[in-house]
């Protein structure tokens, strides 16, 4: 059984691990447990994976009357979801239960630990999530993606495995998908990407940078995010985009494009960093300031420390600062090569296999 919910950062590592278990012929059956409202309720069934739900919600940080009422309801739901989770576990009879984050994994993993079923949690970020911090005292093993997070868990349980998403993309090779966007397949290309929903600050920086980028030899593939596409289109209505620039709302099967890139500009989410380090792609990271515990900044700093990435704090992001960073990268081939080498060294390309080894030690 496996559970990870709420965001793609919790879901995709779980799916990557399931895929690897299937590839190695180690999976007789799998049940994914999520919530009805989370992204997993659509993504997981679309992969042909058995899916069941628990009713659970997160805690409110504000302690006003509404927050207190919500938190009391959360405690009530947590207690009832443990009962439901125990029933699921007894019916499915798993050899191991794995949690990749999100509130729903808290109920399932806690229930599994009480039933003495082997348990593992996976922490994708360099700052531990609330659910994983809670579960760490109950589970058998804690798999981590960043060495720096190890001191936030009981040391005797911690195993550095990396993020399963890394192994999923590690074998990908250039495939000339850039031609789909009207770009040359033999010119150095950077992708600017604000995450699956896009990022207004990154979009604005690109808009402001277009006059400068039009004059550059390198190519830019800009992904605005579907929800922001029309606004960006309107902002660029009177601006010419030269042939070295391409602008799209989204890219289907994004990992396929990555091997054709010489650099990436984007957020510092755990899944993105797992992918770019697995492939050895230099990056300019703009951590989202809107995430819990500022974990994206901590994620980014782990790569900056290894000289595998550059960092632009969002308040310092402008069209000019973006182009300056890109010019530094593309006009200094030795720096670009060194960053690519450092990025690849930082990646853990056998992450799923490492987690499978951990599974085999506890079942």
UniProtKB/Swiss-Prot annotation:
EC code(s) of this entry: 2.4.1.227
One Pfam family matching this protein: Glyco_transf_28
Recorded catalytic activity of this chain's protein: Mur2Ac(oyl-L-Ala-gamma-D-Glu-L-Lys-D-Ala-D-Ala)-di-trans,octa-cis-undecaprenyl diphosphate + UDP-N-acetyl-alpha-D-glucosamine = beta-D-GlcNAc-(1->4)-Mur2Ac(oyl-L-Ala-gamma-D-Glu-L-Lys-D-Ala-D-Ala)-di-trans,octa-cis-undecaprenyl diphosphate + UDP + H(+)
Binding-site positions, UDP-N-acetyl-alpha-D-glucosamine: 7-9, 125, 196, 251, 296
Presence of the UniProt keyword Protein biosynthesis in the record: no
Keywords: Cell cycle, Cell division, Cell membrane, Cell shape, Cell wall biogenesis/degradation, Glycosyltransferase, Membrane, Peptidoglycan synthesis, Transferase
Keyword Cell cycle annotated: yes
Recorded metabolic or biological pathway in which this protein acts: Cell wall biogenesis; peptidoglycan biosynthesis
One GO BP annotation of this record: lipid glycosylation
SUPFAM superfamilies on file: UDP-Glycosyltransferase/glycogen phosphorylase
Positions of transmembrane segments: none
Membrane topology listed for this record: Peripheral membrane protein
GO cellular component annotations of the record: plasma membrane
Localization: Cell membrane
GO MF terms, alphabetically ordered: undecaprenyldiphospho-muramoylpentapeptide beta-N-acetylglucosaminyltransferase activity
HAMAP family per record: MurG (MF_00033)
NCBIfam families per record: murG
Family stated for the protein in its record: Belongs to the glycosyltransferase 28 family. MurG subfamily.
Job description of the protein: Cell wall formation. Catalyzes the transfer of a GlcNAc subunit on undecaprenyl-pyrophosphoryl-MurNAc-pentapeptide (lipid intermediate I) to form undecaprenyl-pyrophosphoryl-MurNAc-(pentapeptide)GlcNAc (lipid intermediate II).
UniProt name for this protein: UDP-N-acetylglucosamine--N-acetylmuramyl-(pentapeptide) pyrophosphoryl-undecaprenol N-acetylglucosamine transferase
Phylogenetic lineage: Bacteria, Bacillati, Bacillota, Bacilli, Lactobacillales
